[in-house]
């Protein structure tokens, strides 16, 4: 779907973005396995998050990004039920998974959300993206939000640069930590 910035920000009203929200989720959490399917008010936890993210105005798409591990395929019906995209990629390299999904979606910018950040506010997500684009940032976040509401915006070019600079993919699950180095990324 094609979207423009929220009408409350008239200077950006007719600008269309090539931004995709990507949710990193899997079934093999070490602290709480299967947390994506935990029941909250009669629905899986992840379905609540996907439904919230669909209410954001600025991104052109929302994609659930998981791994090719057979156990993670149970997440695809949730993506379909929520009306969002689904992508299964590298099991061990989350950064590569996001890059592959971004390529498929032809995204210029990605908003990274983890599957356990169930309370991401679509309005804050939109504000984050607008700030990210206005500032020409490679990486943006909204510090100070309570746990569970966090999301991060990153240009696909910066993500590619981080991938090239990475010595190994073992830290890939925490891919945006490296992007927080101001001497390397804006």
Residue ranges and their predicted role:
Residues 17-66:
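N-terminal glycine-rich phosphate-binding loop and ensuing alpha1 helix
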Residues 57-86:
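Acidic donor-binding segment of Leloir-type glycosyltransferases
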Residues 80-93, 103:
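Conserved donor nucleotide-binding strand/loop of the catalytic core
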Residues 92, 117-119:
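Acidic metal-phosphate-binding loop of nucleotide-sugar-dependent transferases
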Residues 110-111:
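Short aromatic/hydrophobic "clamp" motif used to bind/position activated sugar donors
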Residues 122-144:
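Conserved donor-nucleotide/metal-binding helix-loop-beta segment in metal-dependent transferases, i.e.
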Residues 140-154:
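Short beta-strand-to-loop element that shapes/binds the nucleotide-sugar donor at the catalytic cleft/hinge
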Residues 157-186:
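Active-site oxyanion/phosphate-handling segment shared across diverse enzymes
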């Amino acid at each position: 779907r094609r979207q423009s910035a929220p009408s409350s920000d008239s200077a950006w009203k007719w600008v269309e973005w090539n931004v995709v929200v990507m949710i990193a989720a899997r079934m093999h959490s070490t602290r709480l396995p299967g947390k994506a399917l935990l029941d909250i008010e009669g629905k899986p936890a992840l379905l609540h998050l996907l439904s919230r993210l669909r209410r954001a105005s600025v991104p052109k798409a929302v994609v659930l990004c998981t791994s090719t591990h057979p156990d993670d395929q149970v997440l695809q019906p949730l993506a379909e039920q929520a009306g969002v995209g689904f992508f299964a990629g590298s099991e061990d390299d989350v950064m590569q998974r996001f890059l592959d999904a971004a390529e498929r979606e032809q995204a210029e910018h990605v908003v990274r959300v983890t599957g356990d950040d169930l309370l991401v506010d679509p309005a804050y997500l939109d504000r984050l993206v607008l700030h990210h684009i206005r500032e020409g940032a490679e990486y943006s976040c909204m510090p100070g939000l309570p746990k569970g509401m966090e999301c991060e915006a990153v240009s696909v070019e910066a993500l590619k640069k981080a991938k090239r600079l990475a010595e190994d993919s073992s830290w890939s699950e925490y891919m945006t930590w490296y992007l927080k180095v101001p001497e390397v990324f804006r």
